[in-house]
């Protein structure tokens, strides 16, 4: 029997597969928000797609999602 690839559990929690690629959360939004402007905090809301150049790395880390 062949070996199975392991999923990086930390990456599996951070990325979700969609039809257009992988969804990810914006960085720099979890703490030390007092020095960041409301405009900057507002723009960090929501989900973004992983860049095309990083998709292969995410796919290797999460082969089954």
UniProtKB/Swiss-Prot annotation:
Pfam family, one: Ribosomal_L35p
Keyword Ribosomal protein attached: yes
SUPFAM superfamilies: L35p-like
Example GO BP: translation
GO cellular component: cytosolic large ribosomal subunit
InterPro entries named among the record's database cross-references: Ribosomal_bL35 (IPR001706), Ribosomal_bL35-like (IPR021137), Ribosomal_bL35_CS (IPR018265), Ribosomal_bL35_sf (IPR037229)
Protein name: Large ribosomal subunit protein bL35
Organism: Psychrobacter cryohalolentis (strain ATCC BAA-1226 / DSM 17306 / VKM B-2378 / K5)
């Amino acid at each position: 029997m062949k070996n199975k690839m392991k999923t990086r559990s930390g990456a599996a929690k951070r990325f979700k597969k969609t039809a257009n690629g992988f969804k990810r959360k914006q960085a720099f939004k979890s703490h030390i928000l007092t020095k960041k402007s409301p405009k900057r905090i507002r723009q960090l809301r929501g989900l973004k797609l992983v860049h095309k150049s990083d998709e292969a790395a995410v796919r290797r880390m999460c082969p089954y999602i």
